[in-house]
UniProtKB/Swiss-Prot annotation:
This is Glutaminyl-peptide cyclotransferase. The gene is QCT. Glycosylated. It catalyses: N-terminal L-glutaminyl-[peptide] = N-terminal 5-oxo-L-prolyl-[peptide] + NH4(+). Residues 1-36 are cytoplasmic. It is found in: Endoplasmic reticulum membrane. The chain crosses the membrane at residues 37-57. Keywords: Acyltransferase, Endoplasmic reticulum, Glycoprotein, Membrane, Signal-anchor, Transferase, Transmembrane, Transmembrane helix. Converts glutamine and N-terminal glutamyl residues in peptides to 5-oxoproline and 5-oxoproline residues. Not involved in the major pathway for 5-oxoproline production. Its EC number is 2.3.2.5.
Amino acid sequence: MATRSPYKRQTKRSMIQSLPASSSASSRRRFISRKRFAMMIPLALLSGAVFLFFMPFNSWGQSSGSSLDLSHRINEIEVVAEFPHDPDAFTQGLLYAGNDTLFESTGLYGKSSVRKVDLRTGKVEILEKMDNTYFGEGLTLLGERLFQVAWLTNTGFTYDLRNLSKVKPFKHHMKDGWGLATDGKALFGSDGTSTLYRMDPQTMKVTDKHIVRYNGREVRYLNELEYINNEVWANVWQSDCIARISPKDGSLLGWILLSKLSRGLLKSGHRGIDVLNGIAWDSDKQRLFVTGKLWPKLYQIKLKQASAKSGNYIEQQCLV
């Protein structure tokens, strides 16, 4: 820290002492007050600069419980390629495992499953059905084990990556089981609320959790999850939106708007489709894949900057 200059202290003292002797006490007080006020201005500016410098970046521009202005981080999409997808698959979890191989979990009572799928053909190579009492939900891969959660229960299951045989069930501590993802160490989970959970994969105990908000409003119905470039991406149920979330503190980092996909399917006559759900990431080739429940297609997409009107769309369509 810089030391104060004795020259500046002496100059200020000299200016005060140089007041005429005939000046009244009130004049001297007014002069001193003006000088004190003048000195307070640069001090206040300096204090403000120091405060801003040490503030966490993700709290700039936001009040308690609100989010940053994300207008520069709202993306729409372009379709790079289309692939066949089982139109009877009620997709709940999706992941890419290399060599053009996908793993997918499906839902609905009596139809829930975990499956290994060929990306190019959409062919189901291995299928493991769940007990009819379970409604399959999110899926992720950690090491050689697939982890899956189920709807309306705290029970989940692990599967052997090679043949999809069940290894053992587990109990988690989320309110419900919706989505799962991993960074290779921890598991991230969603339960249909606005909460993003971090869990220990050995014990399934919750080690951290955060409420996700946008402009002060909770982003509810976080569904299928994927870990992409140090972010957790979440489908928002009943919408064509993906929320980009910081796994460190739950702050909202951006939005991806994908309504053109469902519109295109409906326009081409696929009236039986359900909502967008399913994100898969090929980290080696930087390829991004998405699909939906009962969708006949799976898409490879890339992001592009959204139009200026997208902010209104988020308020109306993403915050369901």
